[in-house]
Amino acid sequence: MDKRTCNSQDVEVRKGPWTMEEDLILINYIANHGEGVWNSLARSAGLKRTGKSCRLRWLNYLRPDVRRGNITPEEQLLIMELHAKWGNRWSKIAKHLPGRTDNEIKNYWRTRIQKHIKQADQNMKKPSKCEQNDQKAISTSQASTGPTDTIDSYSPSSYTENTNNNMENITFQGNFPTETNENIWSMEDLWSLQLLNDATN
């Protein structure tokens, strides 16, 4: 383990993972004396840890009301809503998610949601394979045929005859959508659904 000497009191300060014994000491001390000034709490409890280390261990892992388990899709939507409203104010967001810590929410945002946002941005910037193939086909056809070849071979009457003959045998069935916005999904709607889908899988 990493150990260093604190010059002011010559006490070895322990770093690294917490042991079960240290966890029990901290839990019992807080149960008997309550939370207080974390630096003095660490010394009084007999822990060779910094006050900050004790505070973070208690708040993020040992508190009885810390919620265990994965963040639910409902919590994810709430995190996204609140982040849109308040930005990276993790403590403020955590107050609206009982049992979740600001650190847990921040880590979830950075590893899951922000990652999806970056991927979506990259996908929006990259042309799809179909678009790339269309561009290749257009550039290939333009290179192989000169502009005079296509103009000379075009005949409006032959185009109309072929189209009319083919259209006689086609019948359309079903209702076609009208131009309303009620059935149109925004990119934000689709993105939220994708995140929910990923969270449940």
Curated annotation (Swiss-Prot):
Keyword Nucleus: yes
Induction: Circadian-regulation with higher levels during the light period in flowers. Activated by EOBII but repressed by ODO1 via the regulation of its promoter.
Compositional bias of kind Polar residues: 135-159
Keywords attached to this entry: DNA-binding, Nucleus, Repeat, Transcription, Transcription regulation
Disruption phenotype: Down-regulation of ODO1 and numerous structural scent-related genes from both the shikimate and phenylpropanoid pathways (e.g. IGS, EGS, BSMT1, BSMT2, PAL1, PAL2, EPSPS, DAHPS, CS, CM1, ADT1 and PPA-AT) leading to reduced scent production (reduced emission of volatile phenylpropanoids, e.g. benzyl alcohol, benzylbenzoate, methylbenzoate, methylsalicylate, eugenol and isoeugenol).
Tissue specificity statement from the Swiss-Prot or TrEMBL entry: Expressed exclusively in flower organs. Accumulates mostly in flower limbs, to a lower extent in pistils and flower tubes, and, at low levels, in stamens.
A Gene Ontology biological process term: circadian rhythm
One annotated GO molecular function: transcription cis-regulatory region binding
Annotated compartments: Nucleus
Regions of compositional bias (Low complexity) in chain numbering: 160-169
Residue ranges of DNA binding: 38-62, 90-113
Region (Disordered): 121-170
Gene3D superfamilies linked to this entry: Homeodomain-like
Domain of life: Eukaryota
SUPFAM superfamilies named among the record's database cross-references: Homeodomain-like
Protein name, entry field: MYB-like transcription factor EOBI
Protein species of origin: Petunia hybrida
